[in-house]
Amino acid sequence: MMHLNRVHLEEKRAYWAMVMPAFALYLLVMAFPIILSIMLSVSNYSGGKMFGGEKWGFAGFSAYARVFTDPWFWNALKNNLYIVLISVFGQLPLGFIFAYFIYSKIVRAPSFWQGVLYVPNIISVIVVGLLWQVIFSPHGPIAEIVNSIHASSFQGQLKAIFDGAGGFSLSDNVIKKILHLAGPSGQAMFSDPVPELRDLLASYNGQPISEIYTALSNLFVQKWSPAFLTKTDIAMLPVLFVILWMYTGMYLILFLANMQKIDAQIIESARIDGANEGQVMRYIILPALSGTIVNSAILAISGSLSSFALIFAMTGGGPSRVTEILSIYMYNNAFLGRPNFPLANAISLIMVLISVVLIVLTKAVEKRYGGKEE
C-alpha cells in the first residue's frame, strides 16, 4: 500500500514538474500583463518616481470616464467597426466565392489564382502599408497612369487639328481650335490668347511634331494629383480597400481546404438528381462549412481590432485623425506627448471587451441558425 502511495505521489510530482513551467510562462506572458493593465487603468500612474511621475495610487474609474467622453474614442471605434464590417461582409464572402470558383474549376489554372490571391498574406504588413502609401500618393503609379492617359488623349486631338489643317499651321482657325481644346484654364494663361499662342507655336517651328505635341500637352493638360490618403472625407476608403485586398486570400485558403473535405460523391449525386450550382452551394457546401464560416468570422473580428501596423504605415492615423483606430488611439495616449498610461490601459481593456462581445454575438448567431463548429 505504501508502495502504491509512493508511486502515486511520484506521478503527481512528475505531473506538476511538467505542468508548472508552462503554467509559470502563461502567468508571466498572459495573466500578469492583464492584471497589471487592470491595475494601471484604475491608477494615477504617470511613470513613477524613476521618470519624475507622481506616487502610484488608486484613482478609480476616471480613465474609463475620460475615454467614453472623448470624441476621438468614438471616432476610432467607428473606424474599427468599419474594418469589422469590411472583414466579415467583404473578406469572407469574397474568400468563399473565390474558393468555390477554384474548387469547382470554373476558372482556368486554379493553382495559379490560389497562389496569386494568397500572396498578400506572406508580405510584411509594414511593407504592404508603405507600398500602398506610394501607390495612392499624388505622384504614385495611379496618378502617372491617369495623367499619361489625359496627355495621350490631348495629343491625339492636337494631331487631329493639325492633320485637318494639312500639317503644322499658325492659322487663326488652328489657333482657336487649340485654345478651345485647352479650355478656360488654358486660355487664362494668356492676356491676348490668339496672337500669344501663335507666337508660342512659331517658336516651336522646325521641331519634330511629336515634341510640339508633348510641349503643348505639358502646357495645357493639368496634372491630376490624387489625394486619397490626405482628404479627410475619403481617406478611410483606401485603407478599407487594402484590408480587403490583403486578407481575402487567407479565407480563400480556409474555405477551399474545407470544401475539399466534402465527399465529391454527394455533390455528384445531387447534380445527377438535377441540382444546379446554387442549390449545391446552398444545401451542401454552406451547411458543411458553417463551422468554418463562424470560426473565420471570429478570426476576422479579432483581426479587425489589431490593424495597427498596416494603418500606421499607410496614414499614421491621419489626416486629422480620420483613419485613427483604437490601437493607434491607445498608442498615441501611451507614447506621444505626455504619456497617459491609465488612459492607454483603459483603452486596451475596452478593446478586449469589444472583441469578446463581438465574438459572443457571432457564436450566438451560429447557435441561432444551427451551425456546428468544426
Region roles according to the model:
Residues 7-374:
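A structural signal for multi-pass alpha-helical bundles of membrane permease subunits
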Residues 1-7:
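N-terminal leader/signal peptides at the extreme start of proteins
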